[in-house]
Amino acid sequence: MKLKFEKNLDHQSKAVKNTVSVFDELHVQSPKKQGAECINPKVDKNSYAYERNIRELQKAQEIDTRYCDARSNIIDVMMETGTGKTYTYTKTIFELNKALGIFKFVIVVPTLSIKAGTLSFLKSESARSHFMDDYSKTIEVHIVESQKSSKGNKSGFPPAVRSFVEATATQNKIQVLLINAGMLNSDTMQKTFDQTLFDRY
């Protein structure tokens, strides 16, 4: 069964617009070093515009402007349950790609069940065709799973992490690494590997 998403719901559109507006007038620099085709552009958040944009949003939403740390990389977007958070942050991904050229994103979810639901949404034909109509792009999902160690074999990076890191910018793909929070401190992500991400032989 193919679902049809209702476009431009006001509360979702505002969340997307406000998030993207944090980066208004910030300098975006394309990477020039080796492997540049695999690297997101660099957004200069050290400019005055970054803090100004956040403070203007806080004032518009009647949020205490004391809660603004211009040195932080964290932007806290709060939405109530049942308001379409997964759809909203997915649309935000497409809009950030459109505005800034960012093509790699990491989605960290709290539980395995939410991870499964997120994966189901991102890979559904309904979502793919919906966003394809608006942006002429699709999302390629790299799913980080726990790895069982095998004695005697070389230990390599999780395949999803490697494929995500090595993915290059293309006209019609956005790369997303999907991981649950528990995996961040798991053996899979903490151990030392016998190979680096860019080892070929």
Located regions from the model:
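RecA-like P-loop NTPase motor core of helicase/translocase proteins
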Residues: 1-201
